[in-house]
UniProtKB/Swiss-Prot annotation:
Annotated active site: 140 (proton donor)
Gene: SAT1
Lineage: Eukaryota, Metazoa, Chordata, Craniata, Vertebrata
InterPro entries, per database record: Acyl_CoA_acyltransferase, Diverse_Substrate_AcTransf, GNAT_dom
Role: Enzyme which catalyzes the acetylation of polyamines. Substrate specificity: norspermidine = spermidine >> spermine > N(1)-acetylspermine. This highly regulated enzyme allows a fine attenuation of the intracellular concentration of polyamines. Also involved in the regulation of polyamine transport out of cells. Also acts on 1,3-diaminopropane and 1,5-diaminopentane.
The UniProt record lists the keyword Cytoplasm: yes
Assembly notes: Homodimer.
Name of the featured protein: Diamine acetyltransferase 1
Length: 171
């Protein structure tokens, strides 16, 4: 399959974006963790101040999924800032449906993300990969990605909403 196109997502793509987010979560054995709704995606990504940006991979009708979907991959990203190195593109989610892997779709999405990062003068692109996800780790390593966990010893932490609320209310 040589025909596909990568394009910025539009508000009308939110149902497909949510579908792919759920497919990625299932692939990562975390499908019960997805709490977002289509409305959240619409408001958060396509309002006056978008919190994220998204590229999607779309195939022509002759290559649609058996369920009739034309959108077969996506990359959700946003910009952040590192006080040591400046602007970063943070790749939050990146997924291509399994039947559409091996056709260059993921590589083309990553190329488009790289172009966005360079256009915005970002110093690098950061992302997380599950330790068990060897196919993705190898995909990124083939493209010169560095594993900061092993190379620099960084650890990722989070503070859940309930504790944020407690801290915010402290006097």
């Amino acid at each position: 399959m040589a025909k596909f196109k990568i394009r910025p997502a539009t508000a009308s793509d939110c149902s497909d974006i949510l579908r792919l987010i759920k497919e990625l979560a299932k692939y990562e054995y975390m499908e019960d963790q997805v709490m977002l709704t289509e409305k959240d995606l619409l408001e958060d990504g396509f309002g006056e101040h978008p919190f994220y940006h998204c590229l999607i991979a779309e195939v022509p009708k002759e290559h649609w999924t058996p369920e009739g979907h034309s959108i077969v991959g996506f990359a959700m990203y946003y910009f952040t800032y590192d006080p040591w190195i400046g602007k970063l593109l943070y790749l939050e989610d990146f997924f291509v449906m399994s039947d559409y892997r091996g056709f260059g779709i993921g590589s083309e999405i990553l190329k488009n993300l790289s172009q966005v990062a360079m256009k915005c003068r970002c110093s690098s692109m950061h992302f997380l990969v599950a330790e068990w996800n060897e196919p993705s780790i190898n995909f990124y390593k083939r493209r010169a990605a560095s594993d900061l966990s092993s190379e620099e010893g960084w650890r990722l932490f989070k503070i859940d909403k309930e504790y944020l609320l407690k801290m915010a209310a402290e006097e």
